[in-house]
Amino acid sequence: MCNQTPLRSMALDSSGKQPEQQQQQQPRASSGNGEARLKLRRTPNEEHEPENYEDLPLDYSPSLFTSLERYLPEQLLNSTRIDKASFMRDLLLRYSPDTERVRVLRHKEYRDKIMSSYQRLHGEIYTLDPSSFFAPSFLGAFSRKSEPNFRSSMVESYPGIFTFEMFKPQFCEMLLAEVEHMEKWVYDSRSTIMRPNTMNNFGVVLDDFGFDSMLQKLVDDFISPIAQVLFPEVCGTSLDSHHGYIVEYGKDRDVDLGFHVDDSEVSLNVCLGKQFSGGELYFRGVRCDKHVNSDSTEKEVYDYSHVPGHAILHRGRHRHGARATTSGHRANLILWCRSSTFREMKNYQRDFSGWCGGCKLDKQRRQRDSINATKEILARKAAEKTLVELASKSCAE
């Protein structure tokens, strides 16, 4: 289960756990045919079109293999799909801790059990179809993948928070119907499913029901290009993994959501409907781990009201929560988008003033202190010079 990091309540508002990052070695693995060990690329090959691994019996998520393929050395890119899968599997098994390996295998068994029993209601929405899913304004932004095009279809309603129309009403209705069908299957089969995170008691992890590849393609083809333009400090390279789920609020569902940060570099939140009141999101500044519980400033206060079919895109470290849904039923698609490169680089950094409000305040404080200290030194030297001049003048007289 993915976690969110709940935060202590903030003075400005009444209203998952960020995992410890392990020190990772530079991966090397045998090609399986006696060749010297090959090293992964440091950055993904964006021009390479990776394979689909859905039909192979793998120990890890097929989308992980698809994402990892972009990092393969040039010597392997033209190998057969089986050879590439074998190389990547060997790599993952070699560098995954035993506990992680066991967790992954158990999760795979859990997903396989669901997939073998669950009968899809709308099979067509499990494959990304941009023309059927997306609003024309969102599709238009991708006629040319440029910053002016992206910004023309989005509103930066607050620094670092972008809102835009994304899904057609018909797609929202079909996805909601599919989720209701999932919940009926869970009830009828007396199954137990994992909830999206540690803070939501209701909702469905879409990846566990077969949406993994569709959502990863959504990240690769649409969210990642946008994020690299809008959030270059955390998405200088591709977003290479995700966690996608549905949350539900209202009667007999969750009521609100506490103050927290997401386990993501960039988060996409799309309201699917239905009729509801309340449920506004409140944001209170971007923070790194060190400053995650620091106070907010008045300039960091921003509230957002959901609109069905419309999305809000923000940094995962942008602290936020959801107020109570006072009537009706609200359902949202949440997509946590992650960058393994950024997470690795973050292990070696101490200053995040490029995006953390707390680090930025600390840096400004240090700069002010340095300027004041320099002024004091200059003033002291000027005073000493004046005293020397007065003493010299006195001696001369």
From Swiss-Prot:
UniProt feature, compositional bias: Low complexity: 18-27
Enzyme class: oxidoreductase
Cofactor requirements of the protein: Fe(2+); L-ascorbate
Tissue: Expressed in roots, cotyledons, rosette leaves, cauline leaves and inflorescences.
Domain annotation Fe2OG dioxygenase: ranges: 238-339
Cofactor note: Binds 1 Fe(2+) ion per subunit.
InterPro entries per the UniProt record, alphabetical: Oxoglu/Fe-dep_dioxygenase_dom (IPR005123), Pro_4_hyd_alph (IPR006620)
EC number of this enzyme: 1.14.11.-
Null mutant phenotype: Altered plant morphology, including epinastic (curved downward) cotyledons, hyponastic (curved up) leaves, and reduced palisade mesophyll cell size. Reduced number of leaves at bolting and early flowering. The double mutant seedlings icu11 and cp2 skip the vegetative phase, flower immediately after germination and then die.
Function: Participates in the epigenetic repression of flowering genes in association with CP2. Functions in the repression of several members of the MADS-box transcription factors family, including SEP3, during vegetative development via histone modification.
Transmembrane segments: none
Binding-site residues for 2-oxoglutarate, renumbered to this chain: 330
Record region (Disordered): 1-56
SMART domains: P4Hc
GO molecular function, a single term: oxidoreductase activity, acting on paired donors, with incorporation or reduction of molecular oxygen
Name of a matching Pfam family: OGFOD2-like
Natural source organism: Arabidopsis thaliana (Mouse-ear cress)
CC terms in the record's Gene Ontology section: nucleoplasm; nucleus
Keyword annotations of the record: Dioxygenase, Iron, Metal-binding, Nucleus, Oxidoreductase, Vitamin C
Subcellular location: Nucleus, Nucleoplasm
UniProt name for this protein: 2-oxoglutarate and iron-dependent oxygenase domain-containing protein ICU11
PROSITE patterns membership: FE2OG_OXY (PS51471)
Residues that hold Fe cation according to the record: 260, 262, 320
